[in-house]
């Protein structure tokens, strides 16, 4: 999460000053300075644009950001001898699966959005890089809208803008940011959960 409030929340929770560098991962030279300045063993790569709908409206921005930043990570890891990467992929790599629920053995289908395409391409780049470069180790995690918050509520799911999926609407309503949560449709299995703001 690139929100400075999240960085401050981590500092409060840990009671430590946490190094934070704001850099465009697509800017190779600027990103390179991070690798020069800091010692670390592993990279967890979350830096990506992630709104499926927006990716349909702005496909070139998504391809540029998500692919360039990931390739820069791999290039810099090789240059500086960093060997371990965890890649934040997405369940969108499954496309329109033939069978639900999907498992890790479910074959990938064509993605249904530019965002999904970028995640498939990054997985391919990771696979090919692991095969080509000795010592490089990595894994891709295929998330399904991860949610949650620290018990202190200093960090977690409470977006400030317009949410892109249901859970942020629920948390905003529970936190009193939204007055109510409207649920539309009539094909729910016999129950409806009302979410009311505190008080």
Task: Give the positions of each predicted feature.
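N-terminal Rossmann-like NAD(P)+-binding domain of SDR-like oxidoreductases, especially those catalyzing
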Residues: 1-149
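NAD(P)-dependent short-chain dehydrogenase/reductase
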Residues: 127-199
């Amino acid at each position: 999460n690139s929100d400075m409030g999240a960085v401050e929340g981590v500092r409060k929770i840990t009671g430590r000053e946490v190094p934070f560098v704001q850099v465009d991962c697509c800017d190779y030279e600027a990103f390179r300075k991070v690798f020069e300045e800091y010692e670390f063993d592993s990279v967890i790569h979350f830096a990506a644009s992630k709104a499926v709908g927006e990716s349909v409206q702005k496909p070139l921005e998504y391809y540029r950001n998500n692919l360039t930043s990931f390739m820069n990570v791999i290039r810099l890891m090789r240059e500086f001898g960093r060997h371990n990467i965890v890649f934040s992929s997405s369940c969108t790599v499954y496309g329109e699966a033939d069978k639900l629920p999907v498992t890790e053995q479910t074959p990938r289908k064509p993605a249904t959005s530019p965002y999904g395409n970028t995640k498939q391409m990054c997985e391919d780049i990771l696979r090919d890089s692991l095969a080509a470069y000795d010592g490089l180790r990595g894994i891709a995690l295929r998330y399904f809208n991860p949610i949650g918050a620290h018990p202190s509520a200093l960090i977690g799911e409470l977006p400030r803008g317009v949410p892109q999926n249901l859970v942020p609407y629920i948390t905003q309503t529970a936190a009193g940011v939204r007055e109510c949560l409207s649920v539309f449709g009539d094909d729910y299995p016999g129950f409806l959960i009302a979410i009311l703001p505190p008080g």
